[in-house]
Amino acid sequence: MLKQIFNYERMKIIMANVYDKIVGDAHVVCSSSLLKGTEVGHILSVKCHKDLDNGSIITRGAWVEAQVFDSADYAAGKKPYLVLTTPIGYNSDRKYYQEEKYFYNAAGEIARAYELYVDDIFEVSDDAITALATAPVVGNYVEIENGLYKEAAAAPKSGIALKIIEKVNYTNGVSYRLHVESLGM
């Protein structure tokens, strides 16, 4: 009888190559540096009306059910909320699945949204901001565009006013701290 010899080392290399080539779309990473909502403000459960990155600015829509509201695109004059759901990965057998940049809130899912207040400070990864030039400039402002941020030299005339107050360098990327100067309501 012929015995089949199984080469575990070769199989391990083949499998590692397959899994190591998994690539996902990168998303915004957000941190609640100094949000009033983490202590005494409102934290809403919102049903995502579209795919939303953590760090997106939305407004509250209609009541859905048991403490859940619909989310809606932010518009000047509406109350702004910061989408920031704890990034829990259910498939954590590979390092790639554990990287926070691959986490997002899918359309139809329930996400966490923090009510924003004047003087709140939060942090978003650099890919959240569409820069005027090569990189966002500390001291400039951002406007909300499709839920994320577009750099502007001056504060917006209407809507929430967010100022870029600090660039933060990390080993794996760059983030910017944003200061809520006005809610624009």
Protein language model features and the residues they cover:
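Surface-exposed, low-hydrophobicity beta-strand/loop segments enriched in small/polar/acidic residues
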Residues: 2, 7-185
